[in-house]
Every structure is written in C-alpha cells, then in structure tokens.
Amino acid sequence: MASLAGWMAIPNQNVYAASKAYVVSFSQALSNEMIAANSGVKVTALCPGYTATKMMDNPDQGATLRIPSGMMMSAKDVAEIGIKACFAGKDIVVPGLANKFTTIITRLFSKSLITKIFGSFYRNNMD
C-alpha cells in the first residue's frame, strides 16, 4: 500500500512520506521486472489520499487533521479502485479526482514549492 504522500515531501510527515515514496518506486520497478520476465505476476502501487480508516480517527501524533470536504474517500472505494487497477495491469493508481489533480500539481511545480504548500497545509489544519 503506497500513498499520495509518496509523491511529495511533507514536513512533519517526513518518515511517512519517504516510506510511501519507497513503496511507489519499488512497486513500479518490480512491476516492470515481472512484465519483462513474463511472470504473469501483477504489481500495482495503490496511492490513495485521505481514506476513512481508523488511522484517520486516531493518528499516532495525537493530533487530528482537518480534511477539506470532498477529499476523504471510503476504504471500500479505494480498495475497489485498487483491485480493478491491478487486474487491468496498471503499475500505479491514484484513486479520486482530487488526488489525481494533486499528482499533476506535484509534477508541474518545483519540489521546494510543493513542500512549502503541503507543509503549510499540515501546519494550518492540525488540531
């Protein structure tokens, strides 16, 4: 399980974002190796954004992140999208329109600017 966080550096979430970036990179490389070997094994990195799970109810940091409406997806929807993507042979999938838009932004602007934007979002939306 990867995450949208794997697409960017996030201050105060650096270990989480870095570990998810590893999962994205590893999954894409492994997917390519499996295809080249004609193994029949499919590897898909599922990169959801905010997902309604118990992790969101009880974050480890002891703080609660206020998520803008429309940004939270159900775990069921995320899982269904991931399963369909895997069977379709996609090596990476980002469920949700807002999340896809976020990945586009991360490729259009400098990493420095993206880090500032998402760092500011986290600082301003933590209770």
For the regions a language model picked out, list residue spans one by one.
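Catalytic tyrosine of NAD(P)H-dependent dehydrogenase/reductases that use a Tyr as the general acid/base
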Residues: 16, 24
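Residue(s) in the substrate-gating loop at a strand-loop-helix junction
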Residues: 3
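SDR active-site lid
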Residues: 33-98, 108, 112, 116
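Alpha-helical segments that scaffold the active site and NAD(P)H-binding pocket
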Residues: 27-33
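Active-site loop immediately N-terminal to the catalytic Tyr-X3-Lys motif
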Residues: 10-14
